[in-house]
Design a protein with these regions (language model features):
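Surface-exposed peri-terminal alpha-helical interaction modules
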Residues: 1-122
């Protein structure tokens, strides 16, 4: 990724709920783009970007969110590393599409739970 330090600085200005929303949005974009083999490089870039977003978010997240995000980051790293070889196969694209959609939805759920907990003072 180009200008990663500038992206990180800007990203870290957002609160946790915004960052989790950004991770969920990126995963939704991966889900949407992964079905088209012509978009494989864009998907690979989004996978890498989401790995960074998670790396920068984990230190500020509650333990349950940290655990979830680290597991997601491991899977993202595997998809990212292997995507050039995997993307031509429609089955692999479908697996990534489904996985990233489910993880996006789970991230949004965690975001809502985290916001509800922090706003209630718990």
């Amino acid at each position: 990724l180009k200008n990663i330090e500038a992206i990180k600085t800007r990203y870290l200005h957002d609160d946790l709920s915004i960052r989790l929303g950004g991770i969920a949005a990126n995963l939704a974009r991966v889900s949407s783009a992964s079905s088209d083999p012509k978009d494989w490089q864009a998907v690979q870039t989004m996978l890498e970007e989401t790995e960074f977003f998670i790396e920068w978010t984990v230190p500020d997240a509650p333990l349950n969110v940290q655990t979830f995000l680290v597991e997601v980051q491991v899977q993202l790293a595997l998809w990212h590393r292997n995507w050039p070889a995997l993307h031509p196969d429609v089955t692999n694209r479908e697996k990534l599409r489904q996985w990233s959609r489910l993880v996006s939805e789970k991230t949004l759920t965690l975001m809502r739970e985290t916001c509800a907990t922090s706003s209630s003072g718990i």
